[in-house]
Amino acid sequence: MSETLVVELCTEELPPKALKRLGEAFAAGIESGLRERGFLDPESVATSYATPRRLAVSVTCVRPVAPDAEVIDKLMPVRAARDASGITEAFSKKMKGLGRLHLATASLDATDGPDRVYIASDGKADYVYLRSLAKGQVLVRGLDESLADAIEQLPIPKLMSYQRPNGSTVKFARPAHRLLALHGTNIVPVSALDLDAGRITDGHRFQSRGELPIATAEAWEPTLAAEGKVIASFGERRARIVAELEIAAAGAEVIMPDDLVDEVTALVEWPKVYTGGFDLAFLEVPQECLILTMQRNQRYFALAGPDGRLQNRFLLV
């Protein structure tokens, strides 16, 4: 039965300027891997998540077993497989190596059966082909391969090496501490970065009780928000920050370039906006200098009045 799948990798704080891109790539890599292996229904939808301490993806309508697939192997030219005396020794050896020796003496023009040999032209010569039916992969194997590929292809700015408690050395963007993989209510026992998957996730570093057990894949996001004080969606967290900045500005104009909003979104898991201020005397400094240092050094949001001049208030998240 097709069910929702969630995969989450919990880490130390990831590079904020790369977080959004890492989250999107992680989700896209797992989705494409599962789709290529036949685990997704046509209506399956993948949603990416990224917070300072996690990369995750949720995929709807994931099959527990991929469908059986037809495999076509191009074996050898007909002239090498058959001569005047019948089937050649080379062809028999080839079929034995494929575990299909019983088909070596079959007609090369067979037209039915799940496993069969047949002759077809490749446009230049006639070849012997083997058609076989490969059993579909189980999800644990398909996800294990897809997860490994997705991690390997992540656009990580700079890898770091770290040691796990068992002494093994791992390379990743930041140390990874936990892997969650749930298909419906079931744990998918995959492994990555020397971690074995379970159903435990990490809540907010300060505002939650820490470890949180997740009952089902669909419960992951709401449980993380309600009990873990973590908004997992990068887009939802960003939208909340923008909305709260506008409210806190109290009629002033918030100077919030997109790259600053994205960076701040990548620095917090449960955003809350505060108002700060500085001595009016500092407004004698060119406002461009003040805005630059607030944005680049403090990640603050400067405020401007109706006249466009800088105020001595600022907002921080």
Write out the residue ranges for each language-model feature.
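Short hydrophobic beta-strand segments that form the core of ligand-binding sensory/regulatory domains
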Residues: V6, N312-V317
